[in-house]
């Protein structure tokens, strides 16, 4: 079903992202993972514009079209008491800005019937104390998803 399809997964070094990447591979897809953690994937900080541009170039050197973009990377989860301005800004860059920019970078290279999946959370509507940075990022990705649709 996914033979020779191209899938991009952010935050795919562990957890849900790793499971998604593994399932795409099992189904025959070419999978490109980007994660800040070291490993056998493209290593980079997606909060950085230059990293996203280099990653997109890396993928597009190998494939003309992309079939799936899975924006899964986990933003910082800190509460207002412990979250610095820089932490909050980083959470929004990872959780909202990077997904926006990846879609923009690949927009001219999406295959017919391509899919973009942005991992959100019910946390954007049902917040918990000490998770304000995560909650804001998940609210942002939900709004971006709606706008892109």
Enumerate the predicted regions with their spans.
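Substrate-binding pocket helix/loop in short-chain dehydrogenase/reductase
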Residues: 79-89
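Active-site helix of classical SDR
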Residues: 103, 137
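Residue(s) in the substrate-gating loop at a strand-loop-helix junction
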Residues: 121
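Rossmann-fold cofactor-recognition segment
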Residues: 36-50
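Active-site loop immediately N-terminal to the catalytic Tyr-X3-Lys motif
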Residues: 81, 126-132
